Amino acid sequence: MDEPTRNMMNQVFSSFPDSDGNFVEQFQTTGFDARTFELYLYAYFKNSGYEIERDFDRPDFIIQQNGLRVAIEATTINPTAGKINIDKQEMLTKKELEYKQDHELPIKFGSSLFSKLNKRYWELEHCKEIPFVLAIEAFHEKGSLRYSSSSLIQYLYGEKDKRHINEEGSLVVEKEKIYEHKVGKKTIPSGFFYQPNVENISAIIFSNSGTTAKFKRMGYQEGLYTTHMNVIRRGLAYDYTPNALTPEYFVHNLAERSNESWGEGLVVCLNPNAKYPISQDFFVDAAQYYVVDGNTVADIIGFHPYSSETLTIAAEYERGQLPQEIRTLYKSELDNLISHLPAPPNATEVEWYISIDENIIGLILLDKTDKTWNYVCLKKGDTQYRAVDIEIDFDELSTVRNNLVEKMLSYIL
């Protein structure tokens, strides 16, 4: 787990109430995916301005905004015991993928959702007469996050879109009713929202972003790292091009895009038969699915990824132990201390250090033209930091680092 991921998860967990007392143990053992999803939901609620209650061992959350209290229970689809993971199988054909989306996944979603439905959380004293919501994410096999959202939506509403371009060149979307999903001898009815007792569930929240990759991106965005790294995100997103039949492929360098919200990629499916309905604007920064005049419609605003992978191109550099007078500095801390730091046009900041009393800052830079290492030492004045020492053209990172630390100590001691 790299710095942005680890530091962002630690930051979120620092205010996370462990209501059942099992979070850390399960996070470190068999419940890593489920607990990561739960931590992601907490980060989303907290950073989106909801009041959060975790005074009860179940459900996982009660949130409140604008006077409305909503109870939320999280669940995940986990690997089947003894099942071979998809990354050990051959690539799926188009027909095999369609079968998985149309039948296998809906049955897995149904199993998890009905398991939670049968617990009847809405009958708990603190959940009575308020909306109850289930949040779900699929971790059952390698690659499941890439194709699970459409399967869930089809299963919940019991219909799927058939898209084609007509002779006039316009996109035509036709609704096809789904009656059942079948794998082997197991058959379940489609249309979860239309099954008995499901009126007690006001909505289903789905995300394919409740993973460590989300924490990596948010940590990188907040500058929670002490060595330079390039983080790239690529995947498929909603395509706003008129008549688009397929999602749009994207590649983002996160150094150039830093406005991701915790809700980006979140999907909210509202139950048309809910006993206690939720308005379409209650869950912020999320795509909304709901029924109007018998038709399922979607509100998607802004960048909406369906699936993605996050790649760290340059990883952390190995470092030895620092003297007690010096510590590493987050990039975000540096930006707060120094509003404008002039640097050579072909140099990249790689590491940042600061004295414990915050009077001395040290920077290590890589000259991209000749691949040599340089350092800059800055000292705090009356109103700002000023460069007091610069050395250039080191061949090894370890050498420039040792020289910088020695120079910083000479100003400290």
Q: What kind of feature is each model-predicted range?
A:
Residues 1-15, 20-28, 75-413:
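Acidic, metal-dependent phosphodiester-chemistry machinery of nucleic-acid enzymes
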Residues 42-64:
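A short acidic/basic microdomain associated with nuclease active sites
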